[in-house]
């Protein structure tokens, strides 16, 4: 009898696990628009990891939410970019989003049954943006991007980002007083950075 691995409540064969990890590895290779504080492009995987960390750290701020589910959504939310690469938000079209979603869903449908059902349910909830868990994920997704820009050298910013930094994600934090406070704090940081570092 072939060995099975229990991963997050999902039983799968080691070969199936390795196949999923092989796709996920592409998120380490594919870079995003933003730079890290060390001056290199950040990877999609790094972004996904940090919003997952943010969700873990905020567990006690949202005691009524299923933060384990939020973390799971955060971990897989950009898996489509393993196939398409990252497209900056100010360039991404609805057609790009549909293409990414379709490619990801086609891949999810090839997963072992339990994994397929869980991933499909998480992605459906994520895209519907109706539950508190989905709203928390989306707010963290937006905030992490702004935070990373604040951590990067301002010379890497595009002209449009001076305004975008202050408005990006604003609508996504309105559901939560805590998220509104976080956005306000990040905006203060942004203004200080611009005042200090913006080229003349």
Show the residue positions of the predicted features.
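Active-site helical microenvironments for divalent-metal-assisted chemistry
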Residues: 2-200
């Amino acid at each position: 009898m072939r060995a099975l691995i229990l991963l997050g409540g999902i039983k799968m064969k080691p070969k199936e696990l390795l196949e999923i990890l092989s796709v996920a590895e592409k998120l380490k290779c594919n870079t995003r628009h933003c730079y890290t504080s060390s001056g290199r492009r950040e990877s999609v995987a790094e972004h996904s990891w940090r919003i997952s960390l943010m969700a873990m750290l905020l567990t006690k701020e949202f005691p009524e939410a299923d933060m384990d589910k939020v973390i799971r959504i955060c971990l897989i939310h950009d898996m489509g970019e393993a196939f398409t690469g990252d497209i900056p938000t100010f360039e991404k079209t609805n057609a790009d989003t549909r293409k990414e979603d379709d490619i990801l869903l086609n891949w999810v449908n090839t997963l072992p049954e339990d994994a397929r059902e869980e991933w499909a349910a998480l992605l459906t909830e994520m895209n519907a943006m109706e539950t508190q868990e989905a709203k928390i994920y989306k707010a963290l997704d937006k905030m992490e991007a702004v935070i990373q820009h604040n951590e990067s050298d301002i010379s890497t910013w595009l002209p449009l980002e001076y305004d975008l930094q202050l408005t990006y994600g604003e609508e996504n934090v309105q559901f939560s007083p805590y998220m509104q406070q976080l956005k306000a704090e990040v905006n203060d940081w942004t203004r200080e950075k611009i005042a200090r570092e913006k080229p003349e």
